[in-house]
Amino acid sequence: MTSMIGQLHSVVIDAPDAHALATFYANILGMDVKGSPGDDWVVVTGAGYRLAFQEAPDLQPPDWPDPDRPQQFHLDIRVADIDEAEPKVLALGARRLPGGGGDFRVFADPVGHPFCLVWDA
């Protein structure tokens, strides 16, 4: 094992509206939003980790699974019951994407970034 140089501070996600996308993920993860509408940097905290959202007005979101506009990252979000979780994320503005398997389903957040709901199959 190598020695630690530093610790992960946050995962930063680009969005045309940082506060709106932060609120989307905070609602899914049961976390708190630190920032206000119109801020160009908004943080979501809780559960021992943080996500940050930075305004990127010219963001060209990925178009899963199009290789010409591939994902830059994706989050795997563990859920206890996929059939209960899916309608909730859809109601928050997610949309279902092609793909998935016996223990995950693929979605896009309101900006177009893919994320997966995963569960123990």
Annotate each PLM feature:
Residues 2-6, 12-51, 55-57, 84-87, ...:
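Core segments of cupin and vicinal oxygen chelate
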Residues 67-89:
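Mid-chain, well-packed structural core segment of small domains
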Residues 99-100, 117-121:
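Short beta->alpha transition motifs characteristic of CBS
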Residues 42-43, 64-67:
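Short secondary-structure boundary/capping segments
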Residues 58-64:
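A short, acidic/glycine-rich surface segment
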Residues 109:
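Short, acidic, Ser/Thr-enriched surface-loop or helix-capping motifs
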